[in-house]
Amino acid sequence: MTIQFNDETFRDDYTFRNSEWAIKRFPFPFHEDSYMYSVNMEQHKGGPEGSVYEKRFDVDEHYVSEMKDRARVLADDPLRCQSLPHMTLAGWDLLELIMVSKSEDYPDLFELHRDGNKWRWINKPLGIDDTFTFLDEATLPYGPMEYITRQAQGDYAVLDQRDDNLWMDAGMVTTQADWSLDFDIGMNFFEWHAPVPMAHEKGIFVRALKFLLNIQQGAPARRLNWTMTVNPLLDTSPENYHKWGIQKTTLTPENIGAKQHLRVELQTFFRLPRSNALVFPIRCYLCSFQDLMTVPKWGRRLHRVVRDLPVELATYKGFIDNRPLMLEYLEKFDDGLPTSPGIWPDLDTEPPLNK
């Protein structure tokens, strides 16, 4: 296998770590020195070799440990995976999409063999070798959506399209940024986005919905979203806020570099063929402040974004109370030099810190 998978945890002792390779390919979300909500959609047509955008579904060094963490979450709370009865066909669509994509994009890790409806799926990293009948739920240990998303990094919202809207009628959600599938199941696009400040007034969600409704099969789209998380915790769900919310009070000037993480979601959108549903994968990436600061451009830019972010957004993203502590740390990595446009680290051209 070409990827060396980490043995790490996203809870309790938090042994999660990013290799130098993972830091350089981290999906830094800020293309300029300021931030404001926007639709920011683009075609998901791949990206630079080695980047998180290269493949349809990114698989990285955290894969095996993330799947172990998902299994723990589901054992404690099975309602993190739900599918309304009319979404079963969409689950099979999603299973096919992920199996075909991963077997084609990572042939050393995954194999899919098809003889009509008789399928054999081999997942080498997780030690899975299953034979089943496509479209026959009785031949799988779980429903099709749950079966495949127990083997796929990131969350998956499966959206039914009807009445010129999108409805969250199925999903696997265990790595979310403070929202609940159990609460949102059955809601439409505007209902589940209701808590987001400022964006509604700007008409962003109206434009976003129009874009999403028109996504065609074979023409997926993507965007980045971000927030902040203290400690490398994947499961920041409302159901477990009593466990993780208090961790925000543990930051000090001495530990903030290691404990404070930028949490970025690579959100992609695929039209499914049989059901016409839209699947919305939400892949979470975590990177500590101290690791981000090894990229001079990102250090300069992150300080400016956090410093100038409107109070409403800093509050919504949950770090308004810790912003002074963040800025005290980040300002040490901002020498005032201009930054190059775009999200890439530009390590060969960006000047080193001069401070």
Region roles according to the model:
Residues M1-K355:
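Extended, well-ordered protein cores
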